[in-house]
Amino acid sequence: MSWIERILGRTSSSSSSSKSKVPEGVWTKCTSCEQVLYSEELKRNMHVCPKCNHHMRFDARTRLLSLLDQDSAQEIAAELEPQDVLKFKDLKKYKDRLTAAQKQTGEKDSFITMYGTLHNMPVVVASFNFEFMGGSMGSVVGAKFVRAAERALADNIPFICFSASGGARMQEALFSLMQMAKTSAILAKMREKGIPFISILTDPTLGGVSASLAMLGDINIAEPKALIGFAGPRVIEQTVREKLPEGFQRAEFLLEHGAIDMIVQRKDMRDTLARLCAKMTNKPTPFKTAELIVEEA
């Protein structure tokens, strides 16, 4: 081997070894613009692409903890865990699907509920976790939603819920469908008592969740370009045999047609929710807005 070959060989091997040392998960690709992004930067930006502003799916627990004031979160009904009472089996046993989802996400089910403060205002918050079986709604989701709503009723404080779900959990059959009525009933009780319920629809919000609790907010908010509807656009096109309008079932389309009240960027969500909660409970805005600063000047 010549001295040139020895040098080139050494350089090539050291280059390949350095490449192999790059750990997994350091880089990720935007699902919209396909730009390669540094994962830590994406986390700091709350999983919103800094290049195209695409709002990616967001872990439920991280979402709630970033919404609430630091160290104020107390989980509600954390002990509840789904059971395979029907011994359901499709391509896999339901209990095996649950075990796999729990291992993947570190959560017991697809729904997390918490009590805490938002800009020092007490609130109850909840979020679906789409990574857990598509954020599907089963018996535990219904039970946790009711427990959270009951806490809001008992303390006379707002209830905020983030939806990200494919709908009812088919593995629980009628038990799953019953949760649509169960969650709607407790929200009717909240409305009677004048307790605010704010619903935030994120990508995607579909099926039985969109047909029940997700669209029953006193104020319905969506994240930009969130897919919202009952059946997905492909299913509708195959059923009606017609091409759907561009952007059909996206948040902007729904806002234009009066189905939701507003679209809010993820970075603005915390302050927007705080202002709405203060307004709906007849409390002063918990922080000074630009408008207030101008008025005082």
Swiss-Prot record:
Gene Ontology cellular-component terms listed: acetate CoA-transferase complex
Reactions accelerated catalytically: N(6)-carboxybiotinyl-L-lysyl-[protein] + acetyl-CoA = N(6)-biotinyl-L-lysyl-[protein] + malonyl-CoA
Segments traversing the membrane: none
Major localization listed first in the record, in broad terms: cytoplasm
Protein residues bound to Zn(2+): C30, C33, C49, C52
Keyword field contains Transcription regulation: no
EC number: 2.1.3.15
Places the protein is found: Cytoplasm
UniProt pathway annotation: Lipid metabolism; malonyl-CoA biosynthesis; malonyl-CoA from acetyl-CoA: step 1/1
Domain CoA carboxyltransferase N-terminal: residue ranges: 26-295
One GO BP: fatty acid biosynthetic process
Keywords, ordered alphabetically: ATP-binding, Cytoplasm, Fatty acid biosynthesis, Fatty acid metabolism, Lipid biosynthesis, Lipid metabolism, Metal-binding, Nucleotide-binding, Transferase, Zinc, Zinc-finger
Gene Ontology molecular function: any one: ATP binding
Cofactor(s) demanded: Zn(2+)
Pfam families associated with the record: Carboxyl_trans, Zn_ribbon_ACC
Zinc finger motifs (C4-type), residue ranges: 30-52
Binding note for cofactor: Binds 1 zinc ion per subunit.
Residue segments, region Disordered: 1-23
Family: Belongs to the AccD/PCCB family.
Task performed by this protein: Component of the acetyl coenzyme A carboxylase (ACC) complex. Biotin carboxylase (BC) catalyzes the carboxylation of biotin on its carrier protein (BCCP) and then the CO(2) group is transferred by the transcarboxylase to acetyl-CoA to form malonyl-CoA.
Subunit comment: Acetyl-CoA carboxylase is a heterohexamer composed of biotin carboxyl carrier protein (AccB), biotin carboxylase (AccC) and two subunits each of ACCase subunit alpha (AccA) and ACCase subunit beta (AccD).
Name listed for the protein in its UniProt record: Acetyl-coenzyme A carboxylase carboxyl transferase subunit beta
Native organism: Actinobacillus pleuropneumoniae serotype 5b (strain L20)
